[in-house]
A protein has these predicted regions:
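PLP-dependent aminotransferase class I/II
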Residues: 184-260, 264-266
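Short, conserved charged micro-motifs
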Residues: 35, 122, 126, 280-287, ...
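Conserved PLP-anchoring active-site segment centered on the Schiff-base-forming lysine
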Residues: 86-108, 113-115, 119-120
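Active-site phosphate-binding strand-loop segment of PLP-dependent enzymes
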Residues: 115-170
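Conserved PLP-binding catalytic core of the aspartate aminotransferase-like
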Residues: 249, 259-291, 309
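Short loop-beta-helix segment that forms the pyridoxal 5′-phosphate
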Residues: 60-83
Length: 325
């Protein structure tokens, strides 16, 4: 399956650019949370209960959840995406699409009958429903009331609603994680907003019983001491979070201006990426790649390109120049 961020693949296709790559192919914050050197001590220790408890308390507080027992830490949300379908009996699963393709792949692999749908489905028709909110790649987000109603209906019939909130840190008030009770599992990514994807850290927020089942499936030491220490500190850094949301919003608007001037229509996105459409998008994809600008293309939607945010003025300048006719 195609994913952004694979610069070795980009180099194999385009060659190595003289000035290095400007990687705009992911939805990752280009200005990461600064890791204090003291936190690196976690490299020398096994994850102990105190570290894990501190991480879960920080996550529960950051996500508006009162009980840390409703939060499970994992080595990235991808691990949760892989494991969750195996915790439920095989049945009919609706995936709100188009979206992150690993959801459908994981549920199919676990033996579920996957149906890709374009709108929130009726709970009566499915045993599980999966949606990404805000969605990747177009940023759409069903209303919180609609999501809560569907979660209640799924819970009443013994089903589950999985809400992938990988980009929800951009607007904490829009998250449904605090509502995650029986029948609702919210997935929260750490690496995207905090700009530390290599740390491999993510969370599931749900009811305590389901949380215990997920934790048991993941086994002991699901995340490293390093990830626990850095995650706990970053999740508690409210001032950085507020400043970062402002910076990302400003730069997303700047990206809108650049893309519109280059003849794109903005399809949607979040403050970490923009999905844009142009008839000759594939031609421009090749042009940008030869200039060392790596963006995300979609073979099934050849008029679409997804752009992450440049992280420096040099990268903005290179993108602007590469966009010129």
């Amino acid at each position: 399956m195609e994913h952004g961020g694979d610069l070795s693949k980009a180099s194999a296709h385009f060659g190595d650019p003289a000035g290095g790559w400007v990687d705009l192919s992911t939805g990752i914050n280009p200005r990461p949370w600064a890791v204090d050197a003291a936190l690196l001590d976690g490299l020398h220790a096994l994850p102990d209960s105190a570290r894990m408890d501190a991480l879960l308390r920080a996550a529960a507080n950051a996500y508006g959840v009162g009980d840390p027992g409703r939060v499970v830490a994992a080595p990235g949300t991808q691990a949760l995406i892989q494991w969750l379908p195996r915790l439920y009996p095989a049945g009919r699963t609706a995936i709100l699409s188009p979206t992150y393709g690993e959801h459908a792949a994981a549920w199919r692999l676990a033996g579920h009958d996957v149906v890709e749908v374009g709108a929130l489905p009726a709970a009566a028709d499915f045993d599980a429903v999966v949606l990404t909110r805000p969605n990747n790649p177009d940023g759409r987000a069903p209303g919180r009331a609609d999501v809560a109603a569907l979660a209640g209906e799924m819970a009443a019939k013994g089903g589950v609603l999985v809400v992938d909130e990988a980009f929800a840190d951009l607007d904490a008030a829009a998250s449904v994680a605090a509502q995650a009770e029986r029948g609702l599992v919210a997935l929260r990514s750490f690496g995207k907003f905090y700009g530390l994807p290599g740390l491999r850290l993510g969370f599931a927020v749900t009811d305590p019983t389901t949380a215990a089942s997920i934790s048991e499936a993941l086994g002991p030491w699901p995340v490293s001491s390093l990830a626990a220490d850095i995650g706990a500190a970053a999740l508690a850094d409210g001032p950085w979070q507020g400043e970062t949301r402002t910076w990302l919003a400003e730069n997303a608007r700047r990206l809108d201006t650049l893309l519109t001037a280059a003849g794109f229509d903005i399809v949607g996105g979040t403050d970490l990426y923009r999905l844009a459409s142009r008839n000759d998008a594939m031609t421009l994809y090749e042009k940008l790649g030869r200039a060392g600008i790596y963006v995300r293309m979609f073979p099934a939607q050849p008029s679409w390109l997804r752009f992450g945010l440049p992280g420096s003025e040099e990268h903005w300048t290179r993108l602007e120049r590469a966009m010129q006719p």
